[in-house]
């Protein structure tokens, strides 16, 4: 097996930059777009879905859709992992998934913000639910095999550490670019209006992310670095066996709390900046960069 060079590590990490940017768009701006505050509405933001606690008197539409999407994601994760483990493609077990998931992931991210009815409508809510499910399925189909490649491409502890360090950087960079969105759509507002400018911004970002996600597909020959042996175990059989490991259960618990905290931070930051501090949307980027540097 070949050793992964520094250049190849960065080519692999380009994929992380791409999906992190798309993930950042959804995490940072989904709720902000569909549950706008008074400031955003006064600036021309259209209200596309019913507001308030309209789902059983407990959830907002956007909250219910987001929660259902996360539950859907929890079920598809082991299924995609199993399909990838058992893949018999000549190009390896992981790269084919990265190849075919890239375009659906980029498209679904854009379409999440492309409501078919240009006013408050339940049709938009149904469309949003479908697009959110498509997004979560696509990002799972890309990220699960992608993350599985990390220990497979690194043959030693140092190599795996190098890969993890670089992709950590590109993850932060991709998320930071997603936070630049207000600065970019501010330039488009005079020509397209607020909603059109936001959609144009996310479309451009998704196009860049799509290209980045394809970099490891065309630059890394998986079988040159990984001795791929398709697995035969079922998805839920492997999952049950894995959860028998007490240390793994501890890791999963800590990972859950990590993602809950990160999601709360990413979703709430735009509202904190605009609603509480009464600052321009563009300040969101500075707050993210500043807090990331301090952390």
Protein language model regions, located:
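Membrane-embedded alpha-helical bundles of multi-pass transporters/translocases
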Residues: 1-295
